């Protein structure tokens, strides 16, 4: 028999998933009209701004801390099962890279508006809790789920997406030589096909995670990722075309050959 407290938390997780889906819809509608206020698109409003490196570290930290907490917590009921451990590890690995590695590699990132930083921190806290608690406490998989075609395909997409994301970030960081300023057209890798190759990689990564986890939690997270990254990708695409007369006309916005 499932304890009452676990039933209450499962109901809470269900409500939070639907809330995240609603947030994805609001994000698509809202950001379409105002754009994504970060980086070079950050409005010149007065107020507090957070330096790029600490902003990235702090805002991503909750999504690394939640799965780590679940791994060391003896009462994590489902982490005795291999599929749950692997899926939670997939989530954790991404956020270890985003929390501990990515901020260190940033070169001259623009300060982040406090409100943007706070919203990102709250989302990572919220989503980190939803994904970590579901996988560690409630998700039920057969032991051989890790050999199922859905899991294997999803895991492959997750891995390929992460490689694309990290490689594309590397290209962006190295556009300027030491001492150079200004902007350049990204070239190489998936940037030959889309304006936002790093975002495409992250989208593929979370779509793979959703397929591998075969869960509403994973699907909604992938949809939320699409809702935010598509807006940013459109901004990049438009900005590149306005900034550079020789910007390749054949490049798509986010998805090669499609969008």
Swiss-Prot record:
Membrane topology annotation: Multi-pass membrane protein
Major subcellular location class: membrane
Enzyme Commission number(s) from the entry: 1.3.1.22
Coiled-coil positions: none
An annotated GO BP: liver development
PROSITE patterns: S5A_REDUCTASE
Annotated tissue distribution: Liver and prostate (at a low level).
Expression triggers: Its expression is regulated by androgens such as testosterone.
pH dependence: Optimally active at alkaline pHs.
Pfam families per record: Steroid_dh
Location in the cell: Microsome membrane; Endoplasmic reticulum membrane
InterPro entries: 3-oxo-5-alpha-steroid_4-DH (IPR016636), 3-oxo-5_a-steroid_4-DH_C (IPR001104), SRD5A/TECR (IPR039357)
Principal EC category: oxidoreductase
TM stretches of this protein: 10-30, 86-106, 111-131, 146-166, 206-226
GO molecular function: 3-oxo-5-alpha-steroid 4-dehydrogenase (NADP+) activity; 3-oxo-5-alpha-steroid 4-dehydrogenase activity; amide binding; NADPH binding
GO CC term, one of those recorded: endoplasmic reticulum membrane
Catalysed reactions, as listed in the record: a 3-oxo-5alpha-steroid + NADP(+) = a 3-oxo-Delta(4)-steroid + NADPH + H(+); 5alpha-pregnane-3,20-dione + NADP(+) = progesterone + NADPH + H(+); 17beta-hydroxy-5alpha-androstan-3-one + NADP(+) = testosterone + NADPH + H(+); androst-4-ene-3,17-dione + NADPH + H(+) = 5alpha-androstan-3,17-dione + NADP(+)
Similarity remark: Belongs to the steroid 5-alpha reductase family.
PANTHER family given in the database record: 3-OXO-5-ALPHA-STEROID 4-DEHYDROGENASE, 3-OXO-5-ALPHA-STEROID 4-DEHYDROGENASE 1
Function noted in UniProt: Converts testosterone into 5-alpha-dihydrotestosterone and progesterone or corticosterone into their corresponding 5-alpha-3-oxosteroids. It plays a central role in sexual differentiation and androgen physiology.
Protein name, as recorded: 3-oxo-5-alpha-steroid 4-dehydrogenase 1
Organism: Rattus norvegicus (Rat)
Record gene name: Srd5a1
